[in-house]
Amino acid sequence: MRKLFLSVMLAASTYVSACTNFIVGKDASADGSVICTYNADDYGMFINLCHYPASKNAPGTMRQIYDWDTGEYRGQIPEAAETYNVIGNINEYQVTIGETTYGGREEMIDPSGLIDYGSLIYLTLQRSKTAREAIKVMTNLVETYGYCSSGETFTICDPNEAWIMEMMGKGPNSKGVVWVAIRIPDNAISAHANQSRITTFNMKDKKNVIYSKDVVKFARSKGWFNGKDSEFNWNMTYAEPDFGGRRFCEARVWSFFNHFTDMTPYIDYAEGRVKGAKPMPLWIIPDHKVSLQEIEECMRDHYEGTPFALDNDIAAGPWDMPYRPTPLSFEVDGKKYFNERPTSTQQTAFSYVAQMRSWLPRQIGGVLWFGNDDGNMVAYTPIYCGNTVQPECYNTPGADAVTFSDKNAYWVCNWVSNMVYPRYSQMFPSLKVVRDSLEKSYFESQASIEKRALELYLQGDDVAINYLTDYSNETAQQMLARWRQLATYLIVKYNDMAIKPEKDGKFERTETGQGARVHRPGYSDTFKRQIAKFHGDRFAEPVE
């Protein structure tokens, strides 16, 4: 998503919306999958799970381009002769593309460019069979028709390779772009979170590094770089990290890496206060093979157990809420303060963990584990890459950003999560039980579902595709039904800041059939002490 940013010359930026991507190479994962993720974070954003069916198009067919963020019509381009099936951010060849916006130099934005970053993703998914082809398609499109967005980091993956590409325009009324794409080693993990991550790169490694021919020349022409080509540093030239870029953005990358290796040497960098602190590498080698379930947990991260944890300061409130309202920065009596910005955040519109597997037929190998809210507050459901119809709950007629529907996953999941946020430590355990039980059932069923799909595949790929489409849609609808039950359970269980007792999964009653006496837990001891410290004797009872 886009972030509002000030000039790179300012000491701090204002990050209003932001996203997070994690990447796992095939030899770094527990089962040989390439894995990548995307939290699409933006206040007020309402996005359906999109579907673009495969098509063959006559010469002269035109494709209309609408800005992905605003819906504004930008123009049209010739449609490809053939396009591939796309559902969400994965296509039928298991190519998956995500992004995070880092902004960079404002003077490099070209408002007249035809294609925005979001449109670029979905155009490319419809036209690419591999990650390398996707890089070629993306760069050709923006070089031909212009690029109107600010600096972007793209995750581009297929069943065999994972890449990071960073791109920026060349300024007003210029169709050109500068860009660098780097392949993540198969045994490594990487991440990006709204701060440019590419620094120096090996221009001689043609197999694993691809870049625009003028990536250095353009910087020289602007007076932004005058060293040797081999010394050229992408983000120090085009998007130098400031305090906000490090604390609000790079800290999320630090926390992800910290799950899989000791990141203590880089804590000064992530904290953002120490100038000249050693920056983090683009990738690390994890200390063990990483499972899909672990990556889902990383999408739910709030810096737990680190110096950046959100559940142990006064802003967590009485019930240890690891979420903070925005703006992230605020001012008190002329002094500026800030809140932490974790991976899991309330403004997530959708979240996915994509799984790409080279050893299976492509329509079976690609799975988008999808949720329509904050990853911490949803059960990810499987959407197979060849699916031809979205679940109704992820594409609900009549539901939108200002129209609630109890048939829509975004609204039902937000209904639940917004009950839980203010009383997190009390209510979240109830949500977690339901979430984890659903996901456990999906993972336990995956092998048998895919075994049956392989049997049907022998009868024809359409038979397997229809089977997986039906399975994905049924699973998503079952999740929605369970989440509606959870919503009504929570309002009964935790009504009026009290807790109703249960026995054997049922609310207890008295002998006369009335509801049993509720439990009133009050504040935690920690919060009581905070009240006493803040107010002194204001609420102290007199000693009799």
Regions found by a protein language model. Name each.
Residues K3-S13:
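Sec-dependent N-terminal signal peptides
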Residues T14-A18:
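Sec/Tat signal peptide C-region and signal peptidase I cleavage site
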Residues C19-Y117, V137-V290:
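A contiguous strand-loop segment
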Residues G32-T83, A315, W319, P325, ...:
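Active-site rim segments in enzyme catalytic domains, especially the processed small/beta chain
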Residues F218-G371:
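Glycine-rich, aromatic-lined ligand/substrate-binding cores of catalytic
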